[in-house]
């Protein structure tokens, strides 16, 4: 079974809550992936005497969901029940536990749960080779503890700007690369042994079996980085998200986007849903999960922002009417054609961060569809099939490259760039099925085993190349001793 579906699963899981002066909302979507491997934790009021503390986390699983799901249920108890963390509770007496004790307790909790899961029969005998990143925050009355293991990410938005961001654990980072090489491994095509795209994770026991090395010295380490930050009145919100979100939006883009949505809605689930929908349209082909935690100083619904949203709706209504009237003599255009025209225009009052196409398609599609249906009540199709076909073709192209990687490891990224360029050119020239032709070319290049010169494409999106970087890490199969 391939890594991608023919069409994305867009149903969302949502939750929200409040307590300890915080509000949170979350959203997760399977998207184009064959399986949903993300998980999350949201606890307001930590047991064992820390009721004024809260804990939130996102887990991005790969090669299966076993590890991510277990961690979402049990990581917090492994943290709070270990001796180091209990010592933290005792050391502070009536005051907040010391920062160093809390950090040591969190670190010990990660190592303990990783050691504990290794004894699961399916993980021990290799029947399940899954692993998971983990990014979280533990919020006390005085501090915010940011916790990261892998390439999911957390950001803090304070005083109208990104104040802090965790650092992704990638094999190409110098410190991570040094540890991998000291354990006898290598970093090829920005992956551990040419296969795994993260250098720290829970699970992934195939990469944690080097004799004479401790758990934090293995090819893949379960040790988290823990950062503490003093809370401030200016704190607005924290975002936790997997790389399915960060692959297509930068820290600043996402925070500005969230800020703009909080100014028109106080429903945090809706805000998170807007993020996920926008990332899907911007090209993310991974599972997508986001947890949004708002402090009391978070942006509030604004009359000015609501007015701009209303003006945007009116503008789009008039533009759809104009497009339909101009096309009347040549026949009624389909909805996808109308969307493409609008996506190429410089439309006023769009929220920041989503990009023109992303904002129009997902924020105001209902407005556009309503006008279109009124002017064309007998339409046979809403044009969505065209969008699905285009995205599905790109998925087939990436899957063909994944299969080709078995026979052509050294050059697959260059080949992906060439195939994507070929795909775009074919679309411009009007070929009927450019994805199949590109996939055939990929197969031909793989058989020949020749080096393909890298071609530049000025329209290349970040997610195009990120797709192949992510599509092999969760396949859960083995070939020549490497996970594909």
UniProtKB/Swiss-Prot annotation:
Matching SMART domains: PP2Cc
Membrane topology classification: Lipid-anchor
Residues that bind Mn(2+) 1: 60-61
Residues in cross-link Glycyl lysine isopeptide (Lys-Gly) (interchain with G-Cter in ISG15): 12, 142
Lipid group attachment sites (N-myristoyl glycine): 2
Modified positions (Phosphoserine) in chain numbering: 391
The record's free-text note on cofactor binding: Binds 2 magnesium or manganese ions per subunit.
Keyword Phosphoprotein on entry: yes
Assigned GO CC terms: cytosol; membrane; nucleolus; nucleus
Protein name per its UniProtKB record: Protein phosphatase 1B
Gene name of this polypeptide: PPM1B
